[in-house]
Regions:
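Short acidic-hydrophobic, aromatic-tinged amphipathic segments that line or gate anion-handling sites
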Residues: 2-9, 69, 90
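Glycine-rich, highly charged phosphate/nucleotide-binding loops
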Residues: 69-77, 101-107
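Classical nucleotidyltransferase
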Residues: 97-207
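Residue-level signal for inorganic ion chemistry
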Residues: 28, 81, 120, 180, ...
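N-terminal catalytic cores of NTP/NDP-binding nucleotidyl/phosphoryl-transfer enzymes
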Residues: 10-73
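A glycine-rich helix N-cap at a beta->alpha junction
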Residues: 73-90
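Phosphate/ribose-recognition catalytic cores of enzymes acting on nucleotide-derived substrates
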Residues: 197-267
Length: 267
């Protein structure tokens, strides 16, 4: 998969692509339905498939007091899209300047001018452009003028609930991992670096791995059955992970992620 980190300025873009547009935070089952449809349609037409997303989250610029914590890092989003067979990920830098682009300008200059899109698929409630003026209706009208197809994708519902990133965020922060797993369609994961701790667990006979997480959002606290993977090993390890205050070190109230790896004695 090709990744373009400044597609508004780059010229070697996947022209004639079948594309989708969105933030895709969490890459939940609703997002996956859209992306799979894009990949399948692109293969039918012999065209490249492309996911157009924004970084940082648009609210970081237009309403920083309302920006939500992100479920995925940009690198995690890239990994998931690559695994789904997407040909190109276009990461539009969301700046104050870009926030003033009208929906018409985005369509005319980027989708039509730069990408020459063959087809665009979006969620039915997706909005874009300054003031969120762009929507499915506007995009459909532009497609009729410029000759590209547009499809609005219905929401996915599970147990009568509309799948959304906001519900996943709420469930994740509360540690409701059954809902998180159901809505994500996969196990939630955290990336990070192993941090040097105080080694007190090792001295007491149950060494732990302290994780400095890359993720902004993860359960606020609890003990979880987990699996750990390390870049230096070609296998996974069963583990028990505590998130929150170190349970035996009450003088230190820093929030931590500590994993006790079962049957593991390496450093």
């Amino acid at each position: 998969m090709l990744v373009f980190h400044d597609p508004l300025r780059q010229t070697d873009l996947p022209r004639g692509c079948v594309a989708t547009i969105g933030n895709f935070d969490g890459m939940h089952v609703g997002h996956q339905q859209i992306v799979r449809g894009v990949v399948e349609r692109a293969r039918e037409l012999g065209r490249p498939s492309a996911v157009i997303t924004f970084h940082p989250h648009p609210l970081t610029v237009v309403a920083p007091d309302r920006v939500p914590k992100q479920i995925l890092t940009l690198a995690q989003k890239e990994e998931l899209l690559r695994d789904m067979g997407v040909d190109a990920m276009l990461v539009v830098p969301f700046s104050h300047e870009f926030s003033r682009w009208t929906a018409d300008r985005f369509i005319e200059e980027f989708l039509v001018g730069a990408l020459q899109v063959q087809e665009v698929r979006i969620g039915r409630d997706f909005c874009f452009g300054a003031g969120r003026e762009g929507n499915l209706q506007k995009l459909t009208a532009a497609g009729e003028r410029h000759g590209f197809g547009v499809m609005g994708i219905e929401d996915v519902k599970i147990r009568g609930m509309r799948v959304s990133s906001s519900i996943v965020r709420d469930a994740l922060s509360k540690g409701c991992l059954r809902i998180v797993t159901l809505f994500l369609g996969r196990t939630f994961f955290v990336d990070g670096r192993v941090a040097t701790g105080r080694r007190l667990g090792r001295k007491m006979g149950f060494p732990t791995v302290n994780v400095d997480p890359s993720n902004e959002l993860y359960p606020e606290g609890g003990v979880f059955v987990t699996t750990c993977r390390f870049e230096s090993f070609d296998r996974s390890f069963e583990s028990v992970t505590n998130i929150g205050v170190r349970p035996t070190l009450y003088e230190n109230y820093a929030r931590t992620i500590e994993a006790h790896i079962l049957d593991f004695d390496s450093n």
